[in-house]
C-alpha cells in the first residue's frame, strides 16, 4: 500500500485522479491519499478540526495531523510526502518587498528543521521495510517566465494577498519593474527548499541508522516554470481563468466553502480557491514526477 501525505503538490492540485503522480507511480496498488491543498507541516500538537475538499487551499489538516490520523501502518510499504511551502507562505514568496534572505531563512527552517522531525516520527511508525519518498519543489517563476500580459502575474500576486495598487497613494505597481524581484524569491525558495529537504532526508537517515528516506527531485528547470518556453505547471488562460482538469469541481467546492461571490463574504479566499491550480504541476509535469519516483524504485 502507498500512502500520500503533504500539500497541494502531492495532492495533485488540478489533476484528474489518473493523472496524479502517485496514481501513476502506484500502478494499481491501494492508494490512500490524505494530502491536502494548502497544508502546512505544522506540529505534532496541531488540533484543528478544519475539513474542506482537498482542492481548497487551507492550512489544515497539517502534515502532522495527516500522519497522526493513520491508525494502521502495517500494510503501508511506501509513503510519498512533501511540505514546507505553505509554512513559508506564497504571500511572502510572491511579494517583491520580501527580502531573498528572509525567504531562504524561513525555507531552511521548515524544509530542513521541521521536516527532519516529521520524517523521524514518520519512520518510527513504518515497518522495517517501509520507505519514505520526499518530493521536492520546482521554480514557480523564473528568468525565462514571459507572461502574455501584465494582468497574469498581477492576478497571481493578488490571489495570494499581495497588493498591486494603492488607493491612498493613487498608484499601481509596475509589474515589469517588480517581476525580477519576485523571480529571485521563487528561485531562492526552490533551491533552498530542495537543499533543505535533502538535508532533512540525510539527517533522518543518520538518526535512524538506516536509509529509510529518499529525496525525489522533480527534475524541473527554469524553462518549466510559469509562462516559460516549456511550462510543466498549470497557468492562467488569457481570460485569467484556471486551465486545469477539475476547475468545475473546485469552483463548486469553493462556492460551498466561501459562499456566493455576489455577497462577498470572503472574496479573497474565494478568488484564490477558484484559481488554486496555478503554479502546480500539469499533466506533463505530474508524469515527469512519476518518472522520477519510479527511478527511485
Feature roles, as predicted:
Residues 5-6, 11, 135:
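Short hydrophobic segments within beta-strands
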Residues 67, 115-123, 194:
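Generic structural signal for well-ordered alpha-helices
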Residues 83-84, 135-139, 218-220:
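Short, well-ordered beta-to-alpha junction loops that form the rim of enzyme active sites
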Residues 146-191, 199-280:
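Mobile gating loops/cap/lid regions near enzyme active sites that modulate substrate access
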Residues 281-285, 289:
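Accessory beta->alpha helical hairpin/"wing" motif in late/C-terminal subdomains of nucleic-acid enzymes
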Residues 9-109:
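Conserved SGNH/GDSL esterase-like catalytic core that processes O-acyl groups on lipids
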Residues 126-131:
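A short helix->loop->beta-strand "cap" motif at the edges of active sites that frequently abuts
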Residues 41-44, 87-93, 141-151, 225-228:
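Short acidic/His/Gly/Ser-rich catalytic and metal-binding motifs that mark active-site loops
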Amino acid at each position: 500500500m502507498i500512502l500520500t501525505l503533504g500539500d497541494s503538490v502531492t495532492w495533485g492540485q488540478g489533476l484528474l485522479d489518473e493523472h496524479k503522480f502517485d496514481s501513476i507511480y502506484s500502478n494499481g496498488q491501494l492508494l490512500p491519499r490524505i494530502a491536502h491543498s494548502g497544508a502546512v507541516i505544522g506540529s505534532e500538537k496541531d488540533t484543528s478540526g478544519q475539513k474542506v475538499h482537498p482542492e481548497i487551499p487551507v492550512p489544515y489538516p497539517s502534515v502532522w495531523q495527516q500522519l497522526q490520523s493513520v491508525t494502521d501502518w502495517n500494510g503501508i510499504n511506501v509513503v510519498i510526502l512533501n511540505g514546507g511551502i505553505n509554512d513559508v507562505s506564497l504571500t511572502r514568496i510572491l511579494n517583491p518587498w520580501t527580502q531573498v534572505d528572509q525567504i531562504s531563512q524561513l525555507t531552511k527552517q521548515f524544509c530542513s528543521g521541521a521536516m527532519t522531525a516529521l520524517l523521524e516520527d514518520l519512520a518510527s511508525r513504518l515497518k522495517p521495510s517501509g520507505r519514505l519518498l520526499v518530493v521536492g519543489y520546482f521554480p514557480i517563476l523564473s528568468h525565462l517566465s514571459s507572461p502574455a500580459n501584465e494582468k497574469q502575474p498581477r492576478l497571481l500576486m493578488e490571489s495570494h494577498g499581495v497588493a498591486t495598487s494603492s488607493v491612498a497613494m493613487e498608484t499601481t505597481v509596475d509589474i515589469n519593474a517588480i517581476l525580477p524581484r519576485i523571480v529571485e524569491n521563487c528561485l531562492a525558495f526552490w533551491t533552498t527548499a530542495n537543499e533543505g529537504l535533502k538535508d532533512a532526508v540525510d539527517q533522518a537517515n543518520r538518526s535512524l541508522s538506516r536509509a529509510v528516506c529518499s529525496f525525489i527531485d522533480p527534475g524541473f528547470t527554469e524553462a518549466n516554470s510559469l509562462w516559460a518556453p516549456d511550462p510543466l505547471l498549470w497557468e492562467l488562460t488569457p481570460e485569467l481563468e484556471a486551465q486545469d482538469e477539475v476547475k468545475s469541481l473546485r469552483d463548486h467546492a469553493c462556492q460551498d466553502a466561501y459562499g456566493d461571490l455576489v455577497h462577498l463574504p470572503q472574496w479573497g479566499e474565494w478568488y484564490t480557491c477558484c484559481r488554486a491550480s496555478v503554479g502546480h504541476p500539469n499533466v506533463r509535469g505530474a508524469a515527469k514526477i512519476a518518472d522520477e519516483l519510479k527511478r527511485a524504485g
